[in-house]
Amino acid sequence: MITAQPSPRIGFAFVRKAGPLAKLRDVAPTRRVMLVAILVSMVVFLDGTVVNLALPATERDLGGGMCSQQWVVDGYLLAVAATVLPGGAISDLFGRIPVMRFGLVAFGAGSVLAAIAGTPAMLIAGRLVQGLGGAFLVPGSLALINSAFGRAGRPAAIGSWTAWTGTAFAVGPLLGGLTVDFLSWRWIYVLSAIPMIIGFALTFWLCPTPGPSERPRVDVAGAALSSVGLAATVYALIESGRHGWDDSLITGALVVGVAALLAFVAWERRASHPMVPLGLFTIRNFTGANVVSAFVYGGITMGSLAIALYLQEVAGYSATAAGLITLPSPIMSLLFARGVGGMAARIGPRIFLMTGPALAGIGLLLIRPTPHGFHVVTDVLPGRILLAIGMVLAITPLTAVNLASVRSAHSGIAAAIQNATGRTSALIAVACVGLIAAGTVTDATFTRLLQVSAALFFIGAVIGGLAIRNPAVPAEPVPDKVAAPVP
């Protein structure tokens, strides 16, 4: 029998019936939502970091230097950041599950293109297609969870989602290192395509979600302005390391990018159907959560990339050894993210959004080269553990407070805005790595990168304390089920 509001744990209660299809029918609907949402999101988060430790091997095989390494990461992030906001309206227009299927197909196709790449340009193109698909998956999965669970069960559900996706995000460098050392960097992309096939099949396990009361419209002008603004700005930041700021193409790209972003804000203020409803930013907790997200994701992206490059290119560690040092993050996330979500729901998210980023920043400052030699166990591991603790304290409450600050009907766009904020921040952070490191990772530039990353975390902690309020939690009825029994 299907229960009305089961626990969001990822587990299945089977009634004893003959045959696997009968067992599938008895899986609780909300657990089906959790399974699909977590599977598709895990791969997106995993692919966001799995390439970090493969960058040196990719550069040795295809060439291109640090600029190409930055583009391999930023090509993916750029596509996500540019597409995720119009993706919310597109999902409402065509249905969340059909659009999720499109995202799965696009992500899989991009993975195949990247796997067979023979040039840096082809690899970057594959990453762009991956990002296009990924933009429809993470916000859609959070919107499904938000619709499937009532207010009482939602924090634990988001905690479970965060535990698994956070683990995927954190374990990505380790899997990337193992794949590079024992297979090839190309297998990173081959293995990314397989879960997309499984996820595509599982979406037929769910029934279509209720559509909006009004037919949504896609903000084409807003999407174009934001895409041009982000692409031109990131191009200028990355390519300035190769051509210099006195190059007319670089300065022109920066001017075009900034102008397009300013025009985007002006357009959204007067558009009848804006891609970003600016009225949401009058909600204190929504604005605070997104600003904190920007600094936290910028800090973790820059710090993680700096550590991955330094350990291999300067300290001389293998990709696997460099990946092993990331283990504290997935362990902490898997063990404690769900519990942190429940605790934040009881005592409020504010203390977590102050403490978490602060601890993460301190952890990064503990990682530094020493004049008497460098060893990952003594010089990296303590800081990585503290960084992992800080991230697990911050991420679940950050996601929960963003969704809790808006009505359920706006959960899709709220999730999309937060995802776009985090991706855009990560995009800019990666683009700035070359500027801060002056094109080369050394002891001095590595320390400088970690200091900048820590500063981003500290700013996020201050904003979390000043901008976030612990909300009163009113009772909310259990929503309608999203999933339907398998026919």
What kind of feature is each model-predicted range?
Residues 2-205, 340, 347, 353, ...:
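Transmembrane-helix bundle of Major Facilitator Superfamily
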Residues 31-53, 66, 72, 163-164, ...:
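12-transmembrane solute porter fold
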Residues 82, 136, 228-231, 302, ...:
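Residue-level signal for the membrane-embedded core of alpha-helical transmembrane segments
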Residues 120, 184, 211-216, 240-246, ...:
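Membrane-interface helix caps and helix-loop-helix hairpins in membrane proteins
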Residues 201-222, 243, 266-275, 465-476:
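Helix-loop junctions on the cytosolic side of multi-pass membrane transporters
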Residues 211-212, 227-250, 265-266:
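Phenylalanine-glycine-rich, low-complexity intrinsically disordered regions
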Residues 475-485:
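Short, highly charged, low-complexity non-transmembrane loops/tails of multi-pass membrane proteins
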